[in-house]
């Protein structure tokens, strides 16, 4: 169960004296490094995202998700899994590439309103919000590289990345139980008479962090059926879900999910199955683990990208696992955002930064949950390699250089789906 007493480090990134080269910058830079070394993430206070803009992005998401399904389905992109996703009407999401650039957001709104000029107000709100999240990402990446003495690589590093924004909606859990279980969702779907879903069988629950889940819009859930999704949560069975493909439900199988352009979710096979979830983490989950796994909206995983900046607004759900195996329940606060390091950053920093396991539990009833996130991803063909300055006798090279896309080819291979630690299995230096 997530602890309310444990909290992530809170770091103020909006101090007026926070300028590169200043004493305040050095102080905050040290705090950021320590937080990422110890937790792999932190809560960033950033009041440059005004409350007015926060409310505007919330209203924008409400307006967008209120559109007819056929309208939202116009959100398509040549790159796979960047557009609209609908997971059994339990959750849905919209995706935009490099949303910090207004032209890209205009293309997105023109997809939804092709007969006009898009929607200027919505475009501007999304672009302004994405721009602020990108500011946080760039500041944190500068601080990280400076703190390790590799600031000479900053400009090239920033040019080697791109952003994926995803707007997400989750329906409120059924009334009567704030601690909603997977079975509750199955029962709800049965009552709604959604095609392909029967009570007390596999149910798809959408992800949140790095949770652009690559899934086909429909899920045929049922014992012996195929699941056209990535992250499946199955009653008493595990799901071996292959990225963007049909996966057979199988006892003891693993879940391997891909997210928007490689922001990955990896939930391994060969681990203990928690009663009535079938969704297990890379760590063994005992059936009596406080029954917490029953309440997951996203099983325990690490991100595969560089950084994620998440806006939870008022409804909590994110939980982060500490080094000593305790869970921190992250409670949203005004003007705060969660910054999470991914496996790619861990490799780039030669293991000096940890990529934390985290999960999402959907527990608050009666309120629809909206979240927005920016995912920082390496551009195609970018090779991730720790700089020589981070390799010495005390810190031997931990990972071989690798192409980001090649990592995901392995990640979704038959062998990759059976492995607990994808990054280590794919590119760890054997002598390390």
Swiss-Prot record:
Keywords: Dioxygenase, Iron, Metal-binding, Oxidoreductase. One of its GO terms (molecular function) is 2-oxoglutarate-dependent dioxygenase activity. The keyword Metal-binding applies. The keyword Iron applies. 2-oxoglutarate-dependent dioxygenase involved in glucosinolates biosynthesis. Catalyzes the conversion of methylsulfinylalkyl glucosinolates to alkenyl glucosinolates. One of its GO terms (biological process) is glucosinolate biosynthetic process. Signal peptide: none annotated. Disulfide bonds: none annotated. Binds 1 Fe(2+) ion per subunit. The lineage of its organism: Eukaryota, Viridiplantae, Streptophyta, Embryophyta, Tracheophyta. Fe cation binds at residues 301, 303, 358. Its EC number is 1.14.11.-. The gene is AOP2. Belongs to the iron/ascorbate-dependent oxidoreductase family. Residues 281-378 form the Fe2OG dioxygenase domain. 2-oxoglutarate binds at residue 369. Its cofactor is Fe(2+). It comes from the Eukaryota. InterPro entries: DIOX_N, IPNS-like_FE2OG_OXY, IPNS-like_sf, Iron_ascorbate_oxido_reductase, Oxoglu/Fe-dep_dioxygenase_dom. PROSITE patterns: FE2OG_OXY. It is an enzyme of class 1 (oxidoreductase). This is 2-oxoglutarate-dependent dioxygenase AOP2. It holds the Pfam family 2OG-FeII_Oxy.
């Amino acid at each position: 169960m997530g602890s309310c007493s444990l909290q992530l480090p809170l770091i103020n990134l909006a101090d007026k004296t926070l300028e590169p080269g200043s004493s305040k910058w050095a102080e905050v830079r040290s705090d950021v490094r320590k937080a990422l070394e110890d937790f792999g993430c932190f809560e960033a206070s950033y009041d440059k995202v005004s409350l007015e803009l926060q409310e505007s992005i919330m209203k924008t998401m409400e307006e967008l998700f209120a559109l007819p399904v056929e309208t939202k389905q116009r959100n398509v992109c040549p790159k796979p899994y960047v557009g609209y996703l609908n997971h059994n009407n339990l959750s849905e999401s919209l995706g935009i590439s490099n949303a910090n650039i207004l032209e890209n957001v205009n293309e997105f709104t023109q997809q939804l309103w092709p007969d006009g000029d898009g929607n200027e107000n919505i475009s501007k709100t999304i672009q302004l919000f994405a721009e602020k999240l990108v500011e946080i990402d760039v500041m944190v990446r500068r601080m990280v590289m400076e703190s390790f003495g590799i600031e000479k690589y900053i400009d090239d590093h920033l040019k080697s990345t791109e952003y994926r924004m995803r707007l997400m909606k989750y329906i409120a859990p059924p009334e009567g139980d704030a601690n909603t279980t997977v079975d509750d969702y199955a029962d709800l779907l049965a009552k709604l008479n959604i095609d392909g879903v029967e009570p007390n069988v596999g149910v798809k629950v959408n992800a949140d962090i790095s949770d652009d889940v690559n899934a086909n819009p429909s899920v045929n859930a049922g014992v012996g059926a195929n699941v056209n999704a990535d992250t499946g949560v199955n009653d008493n069975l595990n799901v071996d879900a292959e990225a963007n493909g049909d996966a057979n439900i199988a006892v003891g199988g693993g879940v391997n999910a891909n997210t928007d352009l490689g922001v990955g979710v990896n939930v391994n096979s060969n681990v203990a199955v928690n009663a009535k979830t079938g969704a297990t983490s890379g760590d063994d989950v005992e059936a009596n683990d406080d029954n917490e796994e029953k309440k997951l909206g996203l099983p325990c995983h690490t991100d595969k990208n560089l950084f994620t900046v998440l806006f939870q607004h008022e409804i909590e759900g994110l939980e982060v696992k500490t080094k000593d195996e305790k869970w921190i329940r992250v409670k949203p606060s005004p003007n705060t955002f969660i910054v999470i390091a991914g496996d790619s950053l861990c490799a780039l920093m030669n293991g000096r930064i940890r990529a934390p396991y985290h999960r999402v539990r959907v527990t608050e009833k009666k309120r629809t949950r909206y979240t927005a996130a920016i995912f920082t991803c390496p551009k195609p063909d970018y090779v991730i390699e720790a700089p020589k300055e981070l390799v010495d006798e005390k810190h031997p090279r931990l990972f071989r250089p690798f192409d980001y896309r090649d990592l995901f080819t392995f990640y979704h291979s038959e062998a990759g789906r059976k492995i607990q630690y994808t990054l280590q299995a794919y590119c760890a230096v054997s002598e390390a």
